[in-house]
Each structure stands twice: as C-alpha cells, then as structure tokens.
C-alpha cells in the first residue's frame, strides 16, 4: 500500500492531531448538555441524572488539555477514549436490558432509561472516532519513517 506524497501525509497528520481534541470538546459538551437537561427536565432532579455530565466533563477537559498541551495530547486522548468506553458500557449496559419495559410503558423512570441509552450511543460514536484516529495515527507514523 503506497502512501501519498509527504506534503499530503503531513497535512493529514496535522488535521488528525487537531481533530480529536476538538471532537472531544464537542462530545464533552454534548454529554454535559444531556446531563444538565436530564437533571432539569426529569422533574426528580436526582444527582444520577447528571452522570452524562460527569463523563462529559472528563472528555471535555481531555480535549482542552489536548489542544493546549500538544505533548500531552496522545495521553489525554487515550484517557478520553477510556471514558468513552466506560460511558458506552455503562450507558448501553444499563439501558438496553430495560428497553422492553420502555417500549411496554411499564418503567417507573423512562427518562432515565432513555438518557442511559443516549449516553451509551454518544459515547460509542465518540469511541469509534477515537479508535479510527488512533489507527490513522499509527498508519501515518509507520509511513512517515
């Protein structure tokens, strides 16, 4: 497999380095908004409604640090990916088993289940983008030698 010329490679590498911290900030803000929205819209105002915000805060902070401190970018993006993995497992792991009750309308707190599934899906998309970025970075590193 031949890689494009070095100018294109360096452009791709530069775009890749800037893209993941920016995506982390965007996904962090989405999770923050989900948690705050669930907290105020659910009526119960339980601290557990803020769980997406907790995940979002770590991902958002990782993105900001990744942009501001280039030498730490790889490490903080791996932290963000780990948080994305935990959010995926927690959100989908807790929400999907309750989906039949959600469809049947028998759940006591349907908003909580919807938010669990939504958080899991958002974290899954973020995690997939992280994995793609890590693979792209490894390929670029391999061909830049």
Model-derived features: where do they sit?
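Cytosolic juxtamembrane helix at the C-terminal end of the final transmembrane segment
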Residues: 130-145
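Residues within membrane-spanning alpha-helices of integral membrane proteins
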Residues: 21, 25-28, 49, 56, ...
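Individual transmembrane alpha-helices with interfacial aromatic-anchor signatures
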Residues: 107-128, 132
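Mid-chain, well-packed structural core segment of small domains
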Residues: 71-106
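Transmembrane alpha-helix entry/boundary detector in multi-pass membrane proteins
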Residues: 17-23, 27, 34-57
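Canonical alpha-helical transmembrane segments
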Residues: 57-71
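Cytosolic juxtamembrane helix and N-cap/initiation of the first transmembrane helix
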Residues: 2-28
